[in-house]
Amino acid sequence: MTGSKKTPSTSPSKKLSSPPEVKLRHRFAKRQIRRRRIDLACGCSIYIHINCVNNGFTHRGTHHCSSSSEWRFYLGASKSPIFQNTASGDANVHTQPGISHSSQSKPQHEDSVGSPQSLLQLPSLDDVDDDFWADLLK
């Protein structure tokens, strides 16, 4: 016989671990930026998904636009933020009249059980005459 014999491999079995391409895909997916942090003037921080850009939200009576005018800038290490506003002042903040704007944390108001004042009070169906129901169901 002229063929040479193969020696068995000393490396661990490849069937026991994930294929390398799957590991690479998982590592890449973990590195992707999925949300963006915005630090508000009141001291709160929020996270906005990158697909939700240019959508607004209201926090403590102040409307914020999550557009490019609010962004987070890093120098050096990932934990050293410098917050930048490209517009001078608070062009991205819209205050709503009639809502207090104190910077202290307050509990939310409880929802009332009664009907809102903007809706009309409908009469009870028990107060409707029997003649009305007889005419209606003919």
UniProtKB/Swiss-Prot annotation:
One of its GO terms (cellular component) is host cell nucleus. Phosphorylated. Residues 85-106 have a biased composition (Polar residues). Belongs to the geminiviridae transcriptional activator protein family. It comes from the Viruses. Monomer. Homodimer. Homooligomer. Self-interaction correlates with nuclear localization and efficient activation of transcription. Monomers suppress local silencing by interacting with and inactivating host adenosine kinase 2 (ADK2) in the cytoplasm. Interacts with and inhibits host SNF1 kinase. Binds to ssDNA. GO terms for molecular function: DNA binding; structural molecule activity; zinc ion binding. Strong activator of the late viral genes promoters. Enhances the expression of the capsid protein and nuclear shuttle protein. Acts as a suppressor of RNA-mediated gene silencing, also known as post-transcriptional gene silencing (PTGS), a mechanism of plant viral defense that limits the accumulation of viral RNAs. Suppresses the host RNA silencing by inhibiting adenosine kinase 2 (ADK2), a kinase involved in a general methylation pathway. A zinc finger (unnamed) spans 42-59. InterPro entries: Gemini_AL2 (IPR000942). Keywords: Activator, DNA-binding, Host cytoplasm, Host nucleus, Host-virus interaction, Inhibition of host innate immune response by virus, Metal-binding, Phosphoprotein, Suppressor of RNA silencing, Viral immunoevasion, Zinc, Zinc-finger. Pfam families: Gemini_AL2. It is found in: Host nucleus; Host cytoplasm. A motif (Nuclear localization signal) lies at residues 23-37. The zinc finger and the transactivation region are involved in PTGS suppression. Residues 1-20, 113-123 have a biased composition (Low complexity). It comes from Pepper huasteco yellow vein virus. Residues 1-23, 85-123 are annotated as: Disordered. GO terms for biological process: symbiont-mediated suppression of host innate immune response. This is Transcriptional activator protein. Residues 124-138 are annotated as: Transactivation.
